C-alpha cells in the first residue's frame, strides 16, 4: 500500500513591518479592528464577535478592548511598533480600543476620526417608536 501523502497547509511567513495603520470600525452592535501596513495590506484583524462575544455584548466597551488586544498581539508578533489609528463610527468601544492598543505596547503616533458625514445625502430612516 502506498504511503499517505502529507498535507502541508499554507504557513504564514513572519513579516517585519515596523509601521502600520489601525482601522477601528465601531458601531452600536460590534467593533472591528483591522491592522494594516502603510500600503493597506491587512496584517491582523479581530472583532468583538471573533473574540467570543455574542448578541448585545458585542457592542460593549469591554468587547472592543478584547478585540483590540487580540489584533495588537498578532501585529506585535509581525514586528509592528508604531501605528496610526483611524476611527470610524459612533460606537461605545472607540476609546477603549485605542487604550487597549496603547497598553499592548504599540506606540500611537496619530489618532484621526474618519467617520463619514453626509452633506445632505440619503434620507435618514424614520425614528423608532418604542
Curated annotation (Swiss-Prot):
The keyword tRNA processing does not apply. GO terms for molecular function: rRNA binding; structural constituent of ribosome. The keyword Cell cycle does not apply. GO terms for biological process: translation. PROSITE patterns: RIBOSOMAL_S11. GO terms for cellular component: ribonucleoprotein complex; ribosome. Keywords: Ribonucleoprotein, Ribosomal protein, RNA-binding, rRNA-binding. InterPro entries: Ribosomal_uS11 (IPR001971), Ribosomal_uS11_bac-type (IPR019981), Ribosomal_uS11_CS (IPR018102), Ribosomal_uS11_sf (IPR036967). Part of the 30S ribosomal subunit. Interacts with proteins S7 and S18. Binds to IF-3. NCBIfam families: PRK05309.1, uS11_bact. Belongs to the universal ribosomal protein uS11 family. Located on the platform of the 30S subunit, it bridges several disparate RNA helices of the 16S rRNA. Forms part of the Shine-Dalgarno cleft in the 70S ribosome. This is Small ribosomal subunit protein uS11. The lineage of its organism: Bacteria, Bacillati, Cyanobacteriota, Cyanophyceae, Synechococcales. The gene is rpsK.
Amino acid at each position: 500500500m502506498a504511503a499517505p501523502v502529507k498535507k502541508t497547509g499554507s504557513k504564514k511567513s513572519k513579516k517585519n513591518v515596523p509601521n502600520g495603520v489601525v482601522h477601528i470600525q465601531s458601531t452600536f452592535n460590534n467593533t472591528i479592528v483591522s491592522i494594516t501596513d502603510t500600503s493597506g495590506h491587512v496584517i491582523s484583524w479581530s472583532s468583538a464577535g471573533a473574540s467570543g462575544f455574542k448578541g448585545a455584548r458585542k457592542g460593549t466597551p469591554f468587547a472592543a478592548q478584547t478585540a483590540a488586544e487580540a489584533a495588537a498581539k498578532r501585529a506585535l508578533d509581525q514586528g509592528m511598533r508604531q501605528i496610526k489609528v483611524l476611527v470610524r463610527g459612533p460606537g461605545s468601544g472607540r476609546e477603549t480600543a485605542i487604550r487597549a492598543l496603547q497598553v499592548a505596547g504599540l506606540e500611537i503616533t496619530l489618532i484621526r476620526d474618519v467617520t463619514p458625514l453626509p452633506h445632505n445625502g440619503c434620507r435618514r430612516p424614520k425614528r423608532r417608536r418604542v
